[in-house]
């Protein structure tokens, strides 16, 4: 009974996976997102988002971004097998977010050895 409860606890507790390849420090250095037409002013680098997702979520987890912008977090989630819920109130950024997510999903499907139909 103890082992069952311990396993359940381990499954439910907040994940935090710091390791040699994903160190936890209070200073992060990531290249900024280079300017391009339509770039969101607060767009985060994919490397930084993947670092955050690797250290704080499990495979298949759901990630909520209440200020989704152009869905950089969502794109990282698609690439890392996380589910994504994004909220964006600015129509032009919402439209761009939808396009970026659709493109990321299409890319992931073609990258899979056995792409799901649909």
Question: Language-model segments: which ranges?
Answer:
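Class I S-adenosyl-L-methionine
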Residues: 1-118
């Amino acid at each position: 009974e103890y082992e069952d409860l311990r396993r359940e606890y381990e499954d439910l507790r907040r994940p935090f996976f710091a390791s040699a390849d994903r160190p936890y420090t209070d200073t992060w250095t990531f290249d900024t997102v280079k300017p391009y037409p339509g770039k969101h002013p607060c767009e985060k680098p994919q490397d930084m988002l993947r670092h955050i997702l690797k250290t704080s979520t499990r495979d298949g987890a759901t990630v909520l971004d209440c200020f989704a912008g152009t869905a950089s977090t969502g794109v990282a989630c698609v690439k890392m097998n996380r589910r994504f819920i994004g909220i964006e109130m600015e129509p032009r950024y919402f439209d761009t977010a939808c396009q970026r997510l659709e493109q990321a999903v299409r890319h992931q499907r073609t990258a899979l050895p056995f792409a799901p139909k649909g």
